[in-house]
């Protein structure tokens, strides 16, 4: 089995204007980095995100009707791109890891759309049911709305690039959305031949 190269492409990092991630003692590995937020809280700025409700259809299982997902848009002046951030299991847009990532991206010049999945507070009242690893019926409308935002957040006429970042289960949901069928993409208003991101 071959593993992907763990060293980031220096040209890509330069193009994005970011430095490579470096693990630091004592927070080696994903498990300890996750515990870091619990053991060593970070002093984050007051949340200034603009609330944005994104309409989603009823679940195909019939377990819950249509509703909306609450997200928060953080937008610096003249953003380089828009990054949609998904929380993990039991998380929300208010969790420290999501907020810390959003603040870091904003400081680097990226607009950030922090999403609360179906059943996650503070938008729990907007849509019944819960989220799962395979919830494209909820995620594809979010990506459609994000694409619209990419066109409205720029003054140059060319839409901003759209990126996604998912923490834990949020990463799995993001990958599943990228693997959606063309029929799912059409239903969400996305290009059936292209990737959602």
Feature-to-residue mapping (PLM):
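Short, hydrophobic alpha-helix immediately C-terminal to the catalytic nucleophile
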Residues: 99, 103, 140, 175-179
């Amino acid at each position: 089995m071959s593993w992907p190269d763990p060293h980031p492409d220096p040209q890509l990092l330069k193009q994005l204007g970011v430095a490579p991630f470096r693990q630091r003692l004592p927070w080696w590995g994903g498990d300890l980095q996750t515990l870091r937020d619990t053991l060593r809280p970070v002093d984050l700025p007051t949340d200034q995100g603009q609330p944005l409700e994104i309409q989603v259809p009823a679940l195909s299982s019939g377990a819950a009707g249509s509703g909306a997902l609450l997200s928060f848009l953080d937008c610096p002046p003249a953003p380089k791109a828009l990054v949609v951030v998904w929380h993990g299991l039991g998380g929300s847009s208010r969790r420290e890891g999501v907020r810390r990532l959003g603040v870091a991206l904003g400081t680097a010049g990226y607009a950030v759309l922090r999403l609360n999945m179906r059943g996650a507070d503070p938008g729990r009242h907007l849509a019944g049911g819960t989220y799962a690893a395979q919830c494209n019926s909820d995620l594809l409308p979010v990506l459609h709305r994000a694409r619209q935002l990419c066109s409205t957040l720029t003054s140059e006429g060319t839409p901003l690039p759209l990126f996604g970042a998912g923490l834990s289960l949020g990463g799995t949901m993001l990958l599943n959305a990228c693997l959606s069928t063309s029929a799912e993409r059409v239903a969400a208003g996305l290009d059936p031949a292209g990737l959602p991101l």
